[in-house]
Structures are given as C-alpha cells and as structure tokens.
C-alpha cells in the first residue's frame, strides 16, 4: 500500500522560509493597511463579504476538473510575467519587464515594483481568457499578485466577466491565485467573482485551517498549494479537499521535476489534486495524469503557444495509464526496472 503522509506536527512556531518570508511580510503589511482603511467603512464591499456568509459553496472547480473519462483536465493560468527571483534561481535573467507598484486597494501606495520575464502583455485579458476557454481548458486561474506576476484583482474581475456564460451554461470556473495571509484577500477574490482561491501552505501554515474555513464561508473552494510532505500532511489534517502539488519550491524559486508526483502518492483518492510548476511538454502532463492527478495548471506554455488548441487537445486526449499506480499500491514502484526507466525517458 502507498504510504500515507506523515502525521501533521504542531506548526504554531512555524515561519515562512527563504523567498516566502519577505513576500509574507509584504502581504501582511498590505492587508494591515487595508484593514485600517476599512475599519470605519462598515458598508465597504469587502466588509460586507466578511459579515454575510454565502449560503453554500457550489464546488464548480472540483466538478470541472474531476473528469469521469480518465483524462486530465487543464487549468489555464493567466499572468503577464514570471517572477525575477524564479528566473534567477534557474539561471535565466534576460527579457526583464517591470510592473507598476500596487495592491488590492486602488490608489494605495505599494512597495517598489519587481521585474520579471515578460510572458504576454495580455492587453485584453478578458479576450485571452475566452481564448483559453475556447481552446478546451476546464478552468482558468488568474494571478493577483501584481508585484510578481503583473496581474491583479481587476484582471481577475475582467476574466470572470468575460467568461461568465449564462445560468444555463456557465463558463469555466476561475481561480484567484495569490499568497494569502489574511481573510481580506479571500473576500477580495470573492468580490471579484472567483470560484476558488489558492492558499500557499508554505506562507500560512499556522493559519491554514482558518483561511480554508473563511474560503468556505465566503462560498469559495480553497485549493492548498503544497510543496513538502509536511505541508500535504497538515493540509489534509485541517480538512483540505483540493491540493495543488507543485514542482516549484517557492522558498528558493527552483524547479524540482517530479516533486509533485512524489507528493501525490499518499493523497487519498477523494482529494482533488492539481499538478504544475514548469511543465512544458505533453509528456510532463501525462506523467501527472498517470500518477493520479485530476488536472494540471499550465501558464507559460499556454500563453506562448502558437498551436494552443492542438496542445490542449494533446494534453487532454490521452487516457491515464493506471498500471503504474496499481503496482505502487502493491509496494512496487518500478524504479529499479530498466524497462520502466526507459519508458520514463520516452515521456
């Protein structure tokens, strides 16, 4: 049998590591300033969101990406650039582009802008969202961390509006991707019309349970981004039902190919799982599918792809191979089998 995640330990003294530390400090400052502004504005939309809970959490994201045909779903991630710190960690340093400083509250001063590698100008981000939806993605994600990705909460609202569809035929669910440290960020995502919100475990482990509860109370699905066995174990311990298991180590910015697949092995089948982080080929996605993932989140490879529909069709057109997981469940992972190694290289 596959080994379950190790029991979650006490995380009350846990602090964000590496690159995540300054990001968390920045997010806390932003939300602290915003909270001060809203203290005397009880009728502000964000205060009203937090005061009046949603009657239910529809669960549209989970239904959209847990396909019943044995094929992988694709979540298309929209962002204007990739963080400079990630490129630096991977030996990439050219093609820099600077974002404007800003945060959740229009007109508020923000920290100095960072630079990053331009992926797409996204001059009409709503149109780009419709383009991804037409290409066959099952859901969309919009990064709302403007300082690192060049997209913000207004871009999220624009995409939600552009792909809304009708009550009879709703468009794809839209996920707000952010480093969440405060309920106000979740309220902002809900106010913009998001279906779900990502919560980076490495940035908010001691507060993870309360943030997930806030998402549920506001009618959003909470997707926990986890990059270690501890983060996976703790997320499951506090009730997470959707995990984004990424190959990117946010504390260093480095890629760790296969890390998400390794983390997936002990996750129960009833948990919705999303893979991603530096995927470039259909083979990367197929390996995730064979490992049992429900979906893959793709950003740069979609935004810069000249054969978008064909690529999405290639990723989603192959049924998952369950034989690998069967043998893993029997205690054999095939790592010492030359034939298995050759098959892995062909991917």
Task: Please place each PLM-identified region on the residue numbering.
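N-terminal active-site wall of soluble small-molecule enzyme domains
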Residues: 81-223, 229-234, 260-263
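Ligand-binding grooves and catalytic loops that recognize ribose/phosphate and carbohydrate rings
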Residues: 221, 234-242, 248, 257-266
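Short, well-ordered coil/turn segments that N-cap beta-strands
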Residues: 69-74, 136-138, 170-173, 194-195, ...
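An N-cap/entry alpha-helix motif that binds or orients negatively charged groups
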Residues: 2-120
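C-terminal helical cap(s) of enzyme catalytic domains, especially alpha/beta-barrels
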Residues: 257-266, 289, 302-347
């Amino acid at each position: 049998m596959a080994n379950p995640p190790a029991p979650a330990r006490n995380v009350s003294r846990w602090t964000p590591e590496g690159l995540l530390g300054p990001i968390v400090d920045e997010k806390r400052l932003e939300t602290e300033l915003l909270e001060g502004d809203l203290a005397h504005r009880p009728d502000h939309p964000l205060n009203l969101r937090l005061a009046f809970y949603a009657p239910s959490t529809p669960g549209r994201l989970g239904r959209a990406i847990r396909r019943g045909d044995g094929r992988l779903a694709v979540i298309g991630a929209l962002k204007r650039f990739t963080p400079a710190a990630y490129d630096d960690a991977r030996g990439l340093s050219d093609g820099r582009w600077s974002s404007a400083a800003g945060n959740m509250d229009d007109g508020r001063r923000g920290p100095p802008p960072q630079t990053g590698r331009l992926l797409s100008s996204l001059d009409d981000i709503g149109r780009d969202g419709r383009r991804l939806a037409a290409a066959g993605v099952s859901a969309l994600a919009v990064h709302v961390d403007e300082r690192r990705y060049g997209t913000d909460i207004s871009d999220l609202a624009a995409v939600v509006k552009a792909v809304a569809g009708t009550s009879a035929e709703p468009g794809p669910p839209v996920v707000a991707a952010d480093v969440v440290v405060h309920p106000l960020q979740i309220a902002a995502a809900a106010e913009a019309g998001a279906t779900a919100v990502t919560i980076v475990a490495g940035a908010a482990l001691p507060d993870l349970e309360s943030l997930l509860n806030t998402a549920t109370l506001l009618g959003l699905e909470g997707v926990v981004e986890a990059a270690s066995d501890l983060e996976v174990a703790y997320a499951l311990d506090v009730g997470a039902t959707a995990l984004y298991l990424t190959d990117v180590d946010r504390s260093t910015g480095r890629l760790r190919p296969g890390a998400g697949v390794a983390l997936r092995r002990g996750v129960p089948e009833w948990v919705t799982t999303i893979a991603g982080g530096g995927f470039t080929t259909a083979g990367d996605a197929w390996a995730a599918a064979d490992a049992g993932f429900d979906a893959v989140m793709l950003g740069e490879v979609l935004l810069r792809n000249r054969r978008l529909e064909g690529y999405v069709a290639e990723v989603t057109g192959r049924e998952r191979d369950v034989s690998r997981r069967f043998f893993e469940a029997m205690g054999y992972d095939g790592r010492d089998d030359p034939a298995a190694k050759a098959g892995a290289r062909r991917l």
